[in-house]
Amino acid sequence: MHIRTRAALAALAAIAVAGGSAAAAAAQAAPHAPRQLTFVSRLTAIQFFTASGPVTGFPTTPLVPGDRIIGQDRILQNGKPAGHDNEICTVSFGRDVLCQDIVILTGQGDLQVSWTIQWPATGTRGPATFNGIIDGGTGRFATAHGTFHAATLPDGDMQITADLNAGQQ
């Protein structure tokens, strides 16, 4: 082998090793989504829209197919503000309500979640607990999929416990 060829191969090998080391370091430095995520969701705004127009406050009559609910919540982690969410729900048949939500965790990324609930025949609020799915996300949550459980706390806030990437290896 000529000296020039050996030098070129040595340079390529050095670049490959350096590149591999840099890629490994970047992979270790990249933040990963936690396996479990817990936060509190505190209602900050809600609006009901029916066929007759917007409703002030909570509805006093049953919701019907096509009615919409738009809400926003403040997200708290360990009692401190951590972001917010924007949700929209549509009433379907049989009082089934289909909801889509984007949870925005400041400096961490977003989660797209969805759920269905059964709106009560009487009363003004949805169920005290429900479950949903995590469809994906951005930032630390770019590969997130999983499920979550929501439970109403005594003060009216919702405790959300999410299991991310369950079943993935």
Describe the residue ranges of each PLM region.
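Long, low-complexity, intrinsically disordered polar/charged segments
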Residues: 1-2, 113
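C-terminal region of N-terminal signal peptides and the immediate post-cleavage residues
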Residues: 3-8, 19-35
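Sec-dependent N-terminal signal peptides
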Residues: 8-14
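Hydrophobic alpha-helical segments
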Residues: 16, 24, 156-157
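Beta-strand-enriched cores of mature, soluble protein domains
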Residues: 30-169
